[in-house]
Amino acid sequence: CVIAVPSAAAMGKRPEKNILSFHLQGHQSDGPKMVFPLPMGNKKRFFRKSPVTFNKEIVSLKHFITEDGTYGATFSFNKAAAGRIAAITTSNQDKWLVAMLNGRPVDAVYIDKPVGDGRLVIWRGIKQVEISRFEYAMPLTGETSKQWKERIKGHERQRKAAQKEAQEAQNERNRRRNN
């Protein structure tokens, strides 16, 4: 299923960058400098402020539409982050890992087994505009670097054409106003 929605790039602007991080469950006793609270169901859980991963470690994504109309995505990480994810999920089973996207909690997963493939999933809660930003910032899973660069060049051409069209429309409005 393909949904045609104008991207920010097609509207004449480069999309802003998303900030995505995953945070491991901590303890309230760690203190407010080290953890932050999040309500989960009828409980309040605490998560470490220090993230497990960083944006620059994501190498690709594969997104999907969820039943609630938001998006989910699988994020693939570089080797260094994949090793860290494997170690953390091995030693922290029976804890939660929360995804924070642009300053808001999006989804949380329960760690029931080690993650050995360097991939973390957000099952729901990503907005369409955020998916567009990710698509602009990184390759889709299975897409070569060359294919990704060509896709971005297409976005740039659309952006420049939209800017030119907007400028021409403004010039026409100014011309009519002055006559």
Each PLM stretch: what is its role?
Residues 1-4:
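Bacterial N-terminal signal peptides
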Residues 7-179:
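Structural signature of multi-pass, alpha-helical inner-membrane proteins
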